[in-house]
Amino acid sequence: MRRRLRLRREALLTLLLGATLGLLLYAQQEGAAPTTSAPRAQGRAAPGPTPGLRVFQAPDTGAAPPAYEGDTPEPPTPTGPFDFGRYLRAKDQRRFPLLINQPHKCQGNGAFPRGPDLLIAVKSVAADFERRQAVRQTWGAEGRVQGALVRRVFLLGVPRGTGTVAGEAEAGTQTHWSALLRAESRAYADILLWAFDDTFFNLTLKEIHFLAWASDYCPDVRFVFKGDADVFVHVGNLLEFLAPRDPAQDLLAGDVIVQARPIRVRASKYYIPEAVYGLPAYPAYAGGGGFVLSGATLRRLAGACAQVELFPIDDVFLGMCLQRLRLTPEPHPAFRTFGIPRPSAAPHLHTFDPCFYRELVVVHGLSAADIWLMWHLLHGPNGPACARPWPVPAGPFQWGP
């Protein structure tokens, strides 16, 4: 009898504990539910975005930014993808020696005594030789294009883990990567290499070092296009856009992003803690995949960026430098640093089509093979067979669900 009573008490206690645990889990789940913005008032239409501008908000909760084709998802870690402690300790170190230079890149000649009309500067990494070759053989080819002189440089840092001590670098330590890059520089005369680790959060160092280099070695350049190695650029369309522009006036045009909020999700590639940036939104900036600026703006930015505290996201940092100069980046709908979105009415539409690309200036996110293929589709002997200009899908960038 006593044993039965004890068993009943234990069973009842187990049920009570289970119910209590269930209530606690339910309450925790409700408390962690993502918050949403306040509902819009009935009968009032949402304000439309300014044409050419991208208005998007970073997710506040555990949702990471949408993955694009080719992205490799990384499991979240409790410490985040980046060592901000190390970054904060070293962020004031902003001068690194130039290991490979191209001092004559912007020298003039008989036909072009002032040097190039357009300098193309492409961010790259040491191992990405295939993409550099694709750029050299297609849209980044040097020479005359529509009467303009075009020159090209690639911007690199030292591959991580190979040793970036200034003394070692200046002593010319012969490592595998340095030998290959020096051979590539001798062959193509377009490599700029600085002695900082070539990491995502050091792209800001690449930005300020290039601005300083271009101000010193290309003082008379009219315009500069700066972009990634995985973009396709229609240089003819770019030069048409620049033709009526005065290089002595301020200009920075591209895929302009406004009202972007810092991402506070540790698992995100773009995670920024409040200790690094405490304001609710970034200043307006042009997507780093590709933008164009005048020679006058380049020289002003070189001075402004030398006075702005370094920030680990390079295109946002450039927006901070523009803000210091009280300049506003100019939005251009033909700069597509988020690729070409498929219209909702035609979800199966193939956007990798020369009839789309012939209307654009920059498209981001292409492989080396895609760059080569699109270039030859557009510039082949017959050209693309397009009955009429195709409408390019437009609209503000939206984070996926």
From Swiss-Prot:
Topological region Lumenal: 32-401
Name of the protein described by the UniProt record: UDP-GlcNAc:betaGal beta-1,3-N-acetylglucosaminyltransferase 9
Keyword hit for Lyase: no
Biased composition (Low complexity): 38-47
Gene Ontology annotations of biological process type: poly-N-acetyllactosamine biosynthetic process; protein O-linked glycosylation
GO CC terms, sorted: Golgi membrane
Topology with respect to the bilayer: Single-pass type II membrane protein
EC class (word): transferase
Stored Pfam families: Galactosyl_T
Family to which this protein belongs: Belongs to the glycosyltransferase 31 family.
Membrane-traversing stretches: 11-31
EC number: 2.4.1.-
Region Disordered: start-end pairs: 33-85
Species this protein is from: Bos taurus
Gene3D superfamilies: 3.90.550.50
Cellular compartments annotated: Golgi apparatus membrane
Residue ranges, Cytoplasmic side: 1-10
Keywords: Glycosyltransferase, Golgi apparatus, Membrane, Signal-anchor, Transferase, Transmembrane, Transmembrane helix
A GO MF label: UDP-glycosyltransferase activity
